[in-house]
Amino acid sequence: MQAILIGATGLTGGILLELLLAHEQVVGVITLSRKRVQNKHPKHTGHEVDLLDPASYSEHLKGTHLFICTGTTQAKTADKQEYYRIEHDLPLTVAQTALEKGIGAVIAISALGASPDSSFVYNRGKGDMERDIAALGFKQCYFVQPALIGGNRSESRPVERFFINVQRAIDPLMVGFLKKYRIIEPDTIAAAMLYIALHGDKDMRIESDRLKELAALQEKNNL
């Protein structure tokens, strides 16, 4: 596998980068980002680009799998148009350019409840992204749909941290069909994405509880 990764400067993307570089079936990882990715692994090649401008990175799209780990929050990006550009336009632009360059597989982080018809701005943007990338016609196309993501972020997000703490308190009560809404850790998402790239899955859209199962399988394979 030759991987292309966008979003490597984020929490989940950074973990996925390390997993990809450590795996014997991955011959190389190319990261495309606005900021420099601090990783000197011999299998890693990083490029600082404008992800909304294909001319700045199309020549670097040489690989088999595209991993999309980009995203933002409404707290960080209050402007709705800019928010939509990051959640929808950016991943779609990169995916379309990657397909034109011969990349056959895409695995993108979306969100649980993503739908073009959602009344929530976040889920609607992710739903539009899923719909439009799926329509491009990749040979393999997967959207991972995590619930609320845990982990420790470098930037301060007090409101998000509050909701994570509340969610952790009620997680044990979420059983049955509610189990998929439990918090999921970024390393779990990253491990599941690696497993999907290596083995595929029966569904295009993979919800949070299934991601935990796939991550466990990937960890078992590493033993």
Predicted features along the sequence, with ranges:
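NAD(P)H-binding glycine-rich loop region in Rossmannoid oxidoreductase-like domains
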Residues: 3-4, 45-100, 197
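Conserved Rossmann-fold NAD(P)-dependent oxidoreductase catalytic core, especially the SDR/UDP-sugar
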Residues: 33, 80, 85-128, 135, ...
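Short, polar loop motifs at secondary-structure junctions
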Residues: 30-38
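Short, conserved active-site loop motifs that form the nucleotide-linked donor/cofactor pocket
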Residues: 43-45, 141
